[in-house]
Amino acid sequence: MMLKSITESFATAIHGLKVGHLTDRVIQRSKRMILDTLGAGFLGTTTEVFHIASQYSKIYSSNISSTVWGQPDIRLPPTYAAFVNGVAIHSMDFDDTWHPATHPSGAVLPVLTALAEALPRSPKFSGLDLLLAFNVGIEVQGRLLHFAKEANDMPKRFHPPSVVGTLGSAAAASKFLGLSSTKCREALAIAVSHAGAPMANAATQTKPLHIGNAAKHGIEAAFLAMLGLQGNKQVLDLEAGFGAFYANYSPKVLPSIASYSWLLDQQDVAFKRFPAHLSTHWVADAAASVRKHLVAERALLPTDYIKRIVLRIPNVQYVNRPFPVSEHEARHSFQYVACAMLLDGGITVPSFHECQINRPQVRELLSKVELEYPPDNLPSFNILYCEISVTLKDGATFTDRSDTFYGHWRKPLSQEDLEEKFRANASKMLSWDTVESLIKIVKNLEDLEDCSVLTTLLKGPSPPEVASNSPACNNSITNLS
């Protein structure tokens, strides 16, 4: 018997995996990912980058349309609904993170909500249909990342969601559309030609477009494959194919369907407690511990008493921003997150408003920060740590270290805290009743007979009293909501 190519084995898995292959752990973990992603998306609709992306997308029209989450007055063609919802999800860097490093959910979920609403089907798409396609999209991303040692570390060249996310999106769309194994293979080949975005756009308004484009291009790849477009049949096997994105690419054939095991069963995701790059969560935890030695819990930090702040972190240049000037730079700044936590005792959504970033006390603390890169502190979300030392002018030094923050896969958020995060995020755009209904539906998603129940709730409406995009600025972070 002729051995399958790597590309063919992926197509076989995408086409052949069934609801019965889903394990209870995979179902439970993916429902948490879906809830968290929806919340990040609703909150993201308050951002400037979402507004720009949605205004751009309104120039397109179609006979079929899908919901833009939390925006009852905006309907777009499915590809553009997926695009703007993907942009919203990543607009504050508040979405989930996996290992090897990527944001897995943001490129996949918008595809499925857009298709579930726009495409006629009898019987209707069920919650199990959505869960299966979602997990196929997540699985494809994880398998591809495991083919390159480079992917274990934080990226230096390509932003992973723009690479593996595009193929995960295409896989999820292909599964949802019921494409044949041959068409699934073509969709992957087409998606590879849409993949890739440079890390140079990290900490800018353009970075969220990486997730939106991955979602959009994945749908396009599946539709084009369905219509007969063909690509290289070994695109995942070749150095000049998907291997172009990784210097040490070494792909392997996927397990057979009969003995298939999901990567999500083995490796959970991390959920963020505040909207910033995942690596800054270690810094925040270490800074919070040091702060307890300096002042009482709710007391103001006397910044003039501090002589020196040393951060011992992995050497990740795109999160090394000594004096951030925008919210996106602050979200990618070890220095800013450490200083904000020392000063305020907490990091929240308003921590990244420019009026908070530019406070004189923050700039004073930033000027006292030094970075050290211990050789054992590697730039991998699975093994990195952060140590912070604060030296006072009287010579006293206080040091603490974080090896695992709350929300990391080794110390996962409780279901209660995950739901509270969703409530805080989604309530910016939705009524309380709608928020609670969404929590209930996602919790029981495998029992949902018709996904239109879910997509109807995603529309809104947006209560006027919570629809403001720009809360008034105040130098006291506790006065911001």
Swiss-Prot record:
Changing residue 318 to A: Abolished cis-aconitate decarboxylase activity. Residues 462-481 are annotated as: Disordered. It catalyses: cis-aconitate + H(+) = itaconate + CO2. Induction: Up-regulated after lipopolysaccharide (LPS) stimulation. Up-regulated in LPS-tolerized macrophage by LPS. Up-regulated in peripheral blood mononuclear cells (PBMC) of patient after acute sepsis. Expressed in LPS-tolerized macrophages (at protein level). Expressed in peripheral blood mononuclear cells (PBMCs), microglia and macrophage cells. Changing residue 272 to A: Abolished cis-aconitate decarboxylase activity. Changing residue 273 to H: Does not affect cis-aconitate decarboxylase activity. Optimum pH is 7.0. Coiled coil: none annotated. Changing residue 277 to A: Abolished cis-aconitate decarboxylase activity. Cis-aconitate decarboxylase that catalyzes production of itaconate and is involved in the inhibition of the inflammatory response. Acts as a negative regulator of the Toll-like receptors (TLRs)-mediated inflammatory innate response by stimulating the tumor necrosis factor alpha-induced protein TNFAIP3 expression via reactive oxygen species (ROS) in LPS-tolerized macrophages. Belongs to the PrpD family. This is Cis-aconitate decarboxylase. It comes from Homo sapiens.
